[in-house]
């Protein structure tokens, strides 16, 4: 199995300017700006990129991009396309979420190369016409008092009464 990941971050403002450097920091390098995490610049695409090897495909890893210029403090950015976001302000109230990394700043992204397969319980389920869906974007933490799936499921009648035909779960 492949144990490598390619990270890419677009970094160009409305004036065409970008940061002078970008490092990837995460669980695997103790959230430190190290040479092996220095990302390459592709000026034509406006992106920073790096390919890293040696990840355990079954393990989840957390990371951030650390951008900066010669003067001033670094900016810490999560990946805008991540499926999982860890939040230092709210996650401390969720018992099953791992402790927020002490050296990280702001929001933290996560990835896992080999995600566990979901075992569907209803094999005969049919999705309605995708052009006729009424989608409700739901974040458990903000939707119910208990901030979990049980609290959300207890309010499915409310969602159905709104005319919603599909629920999109937002990242945790």
Predicted regions and their residues:
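Hydrophobic core residues within well-ordered beta-strands of beta-rich domains
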Residues: 3-5, 61, 134
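Aromatic-rich, solvent-exposed beta-strand/loop patch
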Residues: 120-139
């Amino acid at each position: 199995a492949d144990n490598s990941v390619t990270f890419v971050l677009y970094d160009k403002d409305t004036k065409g300017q970008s940061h002078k450097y970008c490092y990837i920091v995460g669980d695997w390098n103790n959230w430190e700006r190290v040479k092996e995490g220095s990302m390459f610049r592709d000026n034509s695409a406006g992106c920073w990129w790096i390919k890293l090897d040696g990840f355990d495909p079954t393990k989840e890893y957390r990371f951030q991009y650390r951008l900066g210029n010669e003067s001033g403090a670094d900016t810490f950015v999560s990946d805008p396309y991540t499926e999982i976001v860890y939040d230092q302000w709210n996650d401390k109230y969720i018992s099953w979420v791992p402790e927020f990394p002490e050296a990280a700043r702001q929001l933290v992204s996560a990835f896992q190369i080999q995600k566990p397969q979901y075992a569907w319980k209803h094999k005969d389920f049919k999705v309605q016409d995708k052009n006729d869906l009424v989608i409700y974007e739901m974040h458990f933490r903000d939707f119910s008092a208990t901030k979990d799936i049980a609290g959300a499921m207890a309010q499915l009648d409310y969602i159905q009464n709104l005319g919603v035909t599909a629920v999109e779960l937002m990242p945790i």
